[in-house]
């Protein structure tokens, strides 16, 4: 994995808005409706190539496929794993809303958030296994193809964390969370290894880490939530066993939605568990109004030797285009605490979380935000290394992922 050795590197967090025609294909596929499979595969490959080219053009250093061939960052597993053929008819769980008038105004049933916009939600009814590993191989091949002839610094592919699958997909088959998690870990390990073996950095997506508290375990003591969280991360480490930490980055966020977030778990209360994950880099939401202050916890929490922080420096749900000077300030705050070589700049989260959602941030605005992030990283680099810091460039030398 690259470090910011002579300037602040930039990346993003995986999902990008899908072109409208591809979005329609993904929605049909997700719902089990007829679609042209060969046209879909060709369009995904083309879209990935376009997305990679655009990432390089705006100056992003560590690029990805944008998850353009997936219905979502979690539920894509239903097309690939056995044991997920049933449909979950229940609404998305959640506590009674703390802002009931607001909840009513946006048509959320009191006590439960509907699954609208999440696509088809599967239900686990049998032992996990692979039924369609070729889709993993397709994702790898599409990114490999898109990178041909493109000069880039690094590349990554996202995959879902074992705990996030449990967060989204309940089971009528497994009799305990432990059995579910460890069985799934043994299965997902194959995907994790394939990404790393292809030469890419593996990004493991785990918004369940904080979200399980206020979506599933809001009515238990905080200590009990931490026990559940520790089990999920233990199972994830089981899946990551044997994979070099320097090939893994771990993404944590509080739900990629423009919502009050008034009861989000503070990072300070879970950061010790987050740092137990066998990854070199930790991608953490840090730009939005609820979590922008949390840079300060790193004054008291020591980032372990050799680790990297990938803080969010632009908001992924707001159409405000951050000023490059603000981005630079955020980067410098982190760099002066954990070391400039240990910081890579990124958005808070992805910009195309679910294919069933219209993009929360229009692609035109997203690319403008990315340009501000790149410009901010250049300003921060000059402040941290001096005016001779290497400038980010779309034609910079390609190094190993």
Which sequence ranges carry the predicted segments?
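Domain-level signal for soluble alpha/beta catalytic cores
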Residues: 1-401
């Amino acid at each position: 994995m690259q470090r910011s050795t002579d300037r602040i590197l930039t990346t993003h967090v995986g999902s990008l808005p899908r072109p409208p025609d591809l979005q329609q294909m993904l929605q049909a596929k997700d719902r089990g409706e007829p679609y042209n499979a060969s046209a879909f595969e060709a369009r995904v490959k083309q879209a990935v190539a376009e997305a990679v080219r655009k990432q390089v053009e705006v100056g992003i250093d560590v690029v990805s496929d944008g998850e353009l061939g997936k219905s979502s960052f979690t539920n894509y597993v239903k097309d690939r794993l056995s044991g997920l053929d049933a449909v979950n008819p229940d609404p998305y769980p959640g506590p009674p809303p703390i802002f009931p008038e607001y909840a009513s105004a946006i048509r959320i049933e009191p006590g439960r958030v509907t699954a609208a916009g999440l696509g088809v939600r599967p239900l686990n009814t049998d032992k996990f296994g692979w039924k369609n590993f070729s889709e993993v191989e397709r994702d790898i091949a599409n990114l490999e193809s898109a990178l041909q002839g493109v000069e880039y610094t690094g590349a990554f592919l996202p995959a879902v964390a074992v705990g996030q699958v449990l967060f989204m997909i309940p089971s009528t088959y497994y009799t305990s969370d432990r059995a579910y998690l460890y069985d799934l870990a043994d299965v997902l390990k194959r995907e994790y290894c394939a990404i790393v073996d292809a030469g890419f950095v593996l990004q493991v997506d785990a918004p369940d880490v904080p979200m399980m508290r206020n979506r599933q375990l809001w009515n238990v003591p905080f200590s009990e939530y931490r026990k559940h969280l520790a089990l999920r991360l233990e199972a994830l480490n089981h899946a990551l066993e044997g994979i070099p930490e320097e090939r893994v980055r771990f993404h944590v966020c509080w739900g990629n939605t423009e919502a009050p977030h008034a009861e989000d778990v503070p990072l300070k209360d879970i950061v010790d568990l987050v740092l137990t994950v066998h990854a070199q880099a930790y991608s953490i939401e840090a730009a939005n109004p609820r979590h922008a202050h949390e840079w300060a916890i790193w004054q008291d929490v020591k980032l372990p030797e050799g680790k990297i922080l990938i803080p969010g420096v632009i908001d992924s749900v707001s159409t405000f285009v951050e000023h490059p000077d603000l981005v630079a300030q955020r980067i410098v705050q982190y760099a002066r605490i954990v070391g400039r070589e240990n910081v890579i700049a990124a958005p808070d989260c992805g910009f195309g979380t679910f294919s069933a959602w219209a993009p929360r941030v229009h692609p035109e605005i997203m690319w403008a935000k990315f340009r501000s992030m790149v410009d901010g990283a250049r300003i921060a680099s000059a402040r941290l290394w001096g005016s001779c810091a290497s400038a980010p460039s779309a034609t910079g030398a390609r190094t190993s992922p």
